[in-house]
A protein has these predicted regions:
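N-terminal active-site wall of soluble small-molecule enzyme domains
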Residues: 92-117, 121-127
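Alpha/beta enzyme core
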Residues: 65-83, 122-138, 142-151, 155-177, ...
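Conserved, mostly hydrophobic/aromatic
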Residues: 56, 136, 178, 212, ...
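Glycine-enriched alpha-helix->loop->beta-strand junction motifs that scaffold or abut catalytic
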Residues: 107-111, 130-135, 208, 268-276
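Hydrophobic faces of well-ordered beta-strands that scaffold small-molecule active sites
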Residues: 48-51, 86-90, 112-118, 136-138, ...
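Catalytic alpha/beta core domains of metabolic enzymes, predominantly
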Residues: 218-354
Length: 478
């Protein structure tokens, strides 16, 4: 690793360093390589923090107090005493915000711990003191884009402003969590390192933690080997521990998904010295969103080999809550929570699932997420797809499983084929298939009065099946 001369004084430049060779604005940003070899340094204990009520909520219609409390309860159930979901971050600006925080505090949960977020001014700080919250995030924009263009300050003025509010927090016994906004466009050794070193001095003087949150505001971070600053996630993390002596448990990464890199960047931050990853449920957030909390839970399990006693079935409850109560449409193919994330439509895959669902399912989604693997039926499904749908929908196992060679499966397939021959273009709905299958398979019918189809007749005479269908069902051709 190249050795840099680090001191506690900012490089107080007259003009903003906008890294135009990397961020030309009228072109796609560039990735520059300096081929520095950064050693992996994953902390023994890592965790996830939640900013659904702060950064996430900014992108949606405001949550009600009751909705915030319900989501907070779900976060607690999801964590299940493991401490993996360590903290949850809240706004304090409106009466509604403060009421929600008070109700969450009344729950008395150990996890997630409740923290706040404020701008770098003393008036905001009074809100934290009045709520008796032990830790608060403080906005500390660190790129020249923000310091010069947004705040209209010099680097020295910005540093003095940030140190003053951090010192105020420490003097009142509140842990400051310094949000270094836009760090992936910042002059790392000209501003970030001097600021963080000064913050560590304040920490030592007060004998209290001063936490550092690295905020990849525009999702510009990259995790490639040999990538250079300011975009290198590895070098940012390494610099905190190596040049600034920040303990890993005081470091947090907050990413955005503008370049589809939020999950690999967050995982890289863990691997190179960061203990905490900031996230939101379902990845909600500004523009392309934040790091999905559910993604980092699975990353945690893969890296650590265990999710302790977390209850991941709660993720399915959370997805239902967001869609039904909050009106948020989760993209169908979203991993772990989307309606189609473990749905198979290809006939050849359905045949594999029919033999053993492990062939085409990522893990036991039924056990872990309460989301059994599903086979959707369309014009390409074939006998295997229909048999697999029957087995998964009705939870049939072992000797109760329906074989694709069962003649009654052919009966159902004939009905499916008719739908598409008549111009249908959509997948057959579960409710439609359920009715057809119960009519065809007597042992699966919960209504013994239902007319059971003689599949031997139907196999040779489609019209017989159609008359039974018309008599017993109301099907839609969507």
């Amino acid at each position: 690793m190249h050795s840099y001369k680090c001191d506690n004084e900012v490089e107080n430049v007259a003009e903003a360093n906008l890294y135009r060779d990397i961020f030309p604005y009228t072109e796609i940003p560039k990735v520059v390589f300096d081929n520095k070899n950064i050693p992996m340094n994953m902390p023994k204990d890592v965790w996830i923090t939640d900013t659904t009520f702060r950064d996430g909520q900014q992108s949606m219609s405001p949550f009600t107090v009751e909705q915030i409390l319900t989501i907070f309860d779900y976060l607690h159930k999801l964590d299940n005493g493991s401490g993996i979901i360590r903290q949850s971050e809240f706004f304090l600006y409106t009466e509604k915000d403060r009421e929600a925080v008070e109700k969450c505090i009344e729950r008395g949960y150990e996890f997630p711990q409740i923290t706040a977020w404020i701008r770098a001014n003393k008036e905001d700080f009074k809100l934290v003191k009045n709520m008796n919250i032990k830790e608060t995030g403080i906005l500390m924009s660190c790129s020249d884009y923000h310091i010069f263009k947004k705040l209209n300050l010099t680097r020295q003025q910005a540093m003095e402003k940030y140190l003053e509010i951090a010192e105020e927090a420490l003097a009142n016994g509140i842990i400051p969590r310094c949000h270094l906004e836009d760090i992936t466009r910042a002059d790392y050794f000209g501003f970030v390192v001097p600021l963080v070193r000064r913050l560590m001095e304040l920490s030592a003087k007060a004998n209290m933690p001063v936490k550092i949150r690295a905020c990849d505001t525009l999702g510009l971070g990259v995790c490639h080997d040999g990538a250079a600053l300011p975009r290198s996630v590895k070098q940012i993390m390494h610099g905190f521990t190596h040049y600034c002596n920040v303990p890993s448990e005081w470091i947090e990464w907050h990413g955005h998904n503008d370049f589809y890199s939020v999950v690999p960047n967050s995982t890289t931050a863990w691997l190179y010295g960061c203990a905490g990853i900031s996230s939101t449920l379902l990845g909600i957030g500004e523009r392309t969103g934040n790091c999905p909390l559910e993604a980092m839970i699975v990353e945690y399990g893969q890296l650590k080999g265990s999710i302790k006693n977390m209850d991941l079935t709660v993720l399915t409850d959370i997805a239902t809550l967001f869609e039904k109560d909050l009106g948020y449409q989760i993209p169908h193919k979203t991993p772990f929570v989307g309606s189609d994330f473990n749905v198979t439509k290809a006939g050849i895959h359905a045949d594999g699932i029919l033999k053993d669902e492990e062939i085409y399912n990522i893990f036991d989604t039924g056990k872990i997420l309460n989301r059994p693997v599903v086979v959707a039926v369309n014009e390409y499904s074939g006998l295997a797809g229909i048999a697999a749908w029957i087995n998964t929908f009705f939870r049939l196992t072992d000797d109760k499983k329906i074989n694709k060679r069962d003649p009654r499966v052919i009966t159902v397939k004939e009905w499916v084929d008719e739908q598409y021959a008549d111009g249908r273009t959509s997948v057959i709905g579960n409710d439609e298939l359920e009715k057809i299958v119960k009519l065809t398979f007597e042992e699966l019918s919960d209504d013994k009065k239902v007319e059971v189809i003689d599949y031997k007749v139907c196999k040779s005479k489609r019209g017989t099946f159609r008359s039974v269908q018309d008599k017993n069902l109301e099907t839609s051709k969507r």
